[in-house]
Amino acid sequence: MADVLSVGVNLEAFAQAISAIQALRSSVSRVFDCLKDGMRNKETLEGREKAFIAHFQDNLHSVNRDLNELERLSNLVGKPSENHPLHNSGLLSLDPVQDKTPLYSQLLQAYKWSNKLQYHAGLASGLLNQQSLKRSANQMGVSAKRRPKAQPTTLVLPPQYVDDVISRIDRMFPEMTIHLSRPNGTSAMLLVTLGKVLKVIVVMRSLFIDRTIVKGYNENVYTEDGKLDIWSKSNYQVFQKVTDHATTALLHYQLPQMPDVVVRSFMTWLRSYIKLFQAPCQRCGKFLQDGLPPTWRDFRTLEAFHDTCRQ
C-alpha cells in the first residue's frame, strides 16, 4: 500500500502537512475561544480592551503562521500519478445516484410479474391436464426403462372396422355424403360433401382424424394427378375460417378409449354447417359481420356465432 501511495508523493511532507492541519485547527479554536471569553481579568475598561486586542492579535498571527506553513507543505507533497490503478474503485463514478434509481419499484414490478406468471402457469397446467391433447390411449405414467413402450391401440384398428364406422356415420346424416379412399395404403381419406354448401377433406390415421381442409362446394379438391389435395387452402375466407374452427374441434373432441365416438361427434358438429349461410348469429342476430356469416359453431349446442361474438 505504501508503494502505491509513494508514486509521485513526498510521504515525509505529507506527514508534516497532517501535523500542520492539526496545528491550524488548534489555532482557529483558540481564536474562537478568545472571542467567546471576551475582556476579562482587568480592573479598568481600557486595560481590558488592550489585553483583549493583544491576545486576539496573537491568535490571528498564529492562524496566519500555521496556514502559511500548511500551504508550504502542500506544495512539497506533490501530486499522485495519473496512471495510478484504481481497479474497481474507478467505476464508482459511473454508479447512478441512489435516490434517483427506481430500484424498489422495478423489483416490486418484477415480483408481481413473477407471481402472476406462476399463477397463470398453474391454471394452464390444470386446464391442459383436464383437456389432454394426447392422441393415443397409452398414458406413459411409468418410465420407459421399467416397461416396454406399447403401441397405441387407436392406431392398430383393422381397416374393416374403420369402414364399418364410416358407413354407419354416412347413414346417420342423409344430407352428408362421405366417400372413403385409401390412396397411401391403410390410412383412410374422406371426402365429405355437405349438401351444396361445402366439401371437407378429412385425413385419417386409423380412426384418428389427423387433418381437415374445408373448401367451397364448387372448388376443386383434386390435384392434377387425380388425388385429393390435402395441402392447398380454400380461395374463400369464409371456408378458411371454417377450416380453423374444424382444427379446433379436433382438439376438443378427444376420447382415445372410444375413437368411433370422437369421429361421430366431429361429424355431428360438422353437419351443423348445413345452414352456414342461412343461420343468424345467436349473439347479435345478424347474418353478416365484416362480410362473413357466422362461421363458429358451439361444440355443445351447435349454435351459430360470429367469430367475434362467441367471446
From Swiss-Prot:
A GO cellular-component term linked to this record: core mediator complex
Keyword rRNA-binding among record annotations: no
Protein location: Nucleus
Keyword Nucleus: yes
UniProt KW keywords: Activator, Methylation, Nucleus, Phosphoprotein, Transcription, Transcription regulation
Residue numbers of Phosphoserine PTMs: S132
Superkingdom assignment: Eukaryota
Positions bearing N6-methyllysine: K134
GO molecular function: transcription coactivator activity
InterPro entries hit by this protein: Mediator_Med27 (IPR021627)
GO terms under biological process: regulation of transcription by RNA polymerase II; somatic stem cell population maintenance
Subunit structure: Component of the Mediator complex, which is composed of MED1, MED4, MED6, MED7, MED8, MED9, MED10, MED11, MED12, MED13, MED13L, MED14, MED15, MED16, MED17, MED18, MED19, MED20, MED21, MED22, MED23, MED24, MED25, MED26, MED27, MED29, MED30, MED31, CCNC, CDK8 and CDC2L6/CDK11. The MED12, MED13, CCNC and CDK8 subunits form a distinct module termed the CDK8 module. Mediator containing the CDK8 module is less active than Mediator lacking this module in supporting transcriptional activation.
Function as written in the Swiss-Prot or TrEMBL entry: Component of the Mediator complex, a coactivator involved in the regulated transcription of nearly all RNA polymerase II-dependent genes. Mediator functions as a bridge to convey information from gene-specific regulatory proteins to the basal RNA polymerase II transcription machinery. Mediator is recruited to promoters by direct interactions with regulatory proteins and serves as a scaffold for the assembly of a functional preinitiation complex with RNA polymerase II and the general transcription factors.
Stored PANTHER family: 34 KDA TRANSCRIPTIONAL CO-ACTIVATOR-RELATED (PTHR13130), MEDIATOR OF RNA POLYMERASE II TRANSCRIPTION SUBUNIT 27 (PTHR13130:SF4)
Homology family: Belongs to the Mediator complex subunit 27 family.
Name of the protein described by the UniProt record: Mediator of RNA polymerase II transcription subunit 27
Organism for this UniProt entry: Bos taurus (Bovine)
Chain's gene name: MED27
